[in-house]
């Protein structure tokens, strides 16, 4: 599962207006008066909030603000401080789970003087941490592992899986990794879901937050078999995002998830069985249906993953692995799906879908969704060809004729009005000599 830059951008749009105001405030003049800011403090408590405090002295001011910036936001958000005095305090509420652990928050107070000018205090940075546990840490080349249950041998095995997963994905996709990735291992389901937030689906066992470069996984120290799949799977999402990220367009989810499954476990027998059964029962979803969020029902959810890796497997069997590096590089330029697939494979996404369906024995498909409505009944007294219909033909024809004449007359009036306005504008637009 992925928490992507696109997902965070939706929250960024929600604070666009306040962020714009914040930017304007940053660019504003500084008053002749000034204040002295004390040392800022920030205290983070998981599931409750982050409390920012700072003393201020000197000139009087009209109001005070908190300027906050979160990873992935399009700009800072500005929040008015209620009843500001010599000590400024603001609590960033995290009780609703809107941010995940390991999110780095930048903040600073600013005061607004009576003349509208502003003065900002020093910036403070704090990491929102899951402080419910005593975390232990192991540092690798790319991955920093955090865990609280299990011995050092368990942690080393999980770290090795992460390092190998990063290296394998980077080689396959042609991506050079340099920035570190934090990997948090949770031992029980409830704690894991609490960390990810209330929107987490019940069948998720791992999540990669590509904005904060953080991997969360539910791994019991006694279940390293599952870890061998989920760890490289989620880390592939990070590598894929590093290679394709751009300000304009995200690749389809089936491609992202399909690559993560393929590089972590291949196109396994269980996924093959799901796709085969769906093909026989004519319940396969086209790839166009898997570009965004996957279905929520369990059977369609797992089928979506199976179809995704099936499509990736089909492309690799037909075209080889090399075009995927071209695909990733093209996506990084902001190309559309059709542009990226055409550059890499020589075919657009419709052709990819058609070829994949044919590879699964499907040459025709039934279209669902909005359909053209059938023609309704002819009203009494009307005809479909302008002829008579019983004894009411004259009445129907005359009624239709009057309606048409009225419409034409109204159209003529509108055209005359437009012409008059256009003439007036043209006349007024004449240059003055």
For each predicted feature, which ranges?
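Juxtacatalytic substrate-recognition/specificity segment
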Residues: 134-252, 269, 294, 298, ...
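C-terminal membrane-anchoring or membrane-association module
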Residues: 405-433
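Soluble, non-membrane globular domain cores that form compact, hydrophobic packing
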Residues: 28-30, 106, 383-390, 417
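Glycan-association/targeting regions that enable binding to alpha-glucans and other polysaccharides
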Residues: 22, 30-134, 431
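Juxtamembrane/start-of-transmembrane alpha-helix segments at the extracytoplasmic/lumenal side
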Residues: 392-410
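N-terminal secretory signal peptides that target proteins for export/translocation
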Residues: 1-9
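Bacterial N-terminal signal peptides
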Residues: 15-25
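Acidic/His/Gly-enriched intrinsically disordered linker/tail segments
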Residues: 202-214, 219, 225-230, 242-395
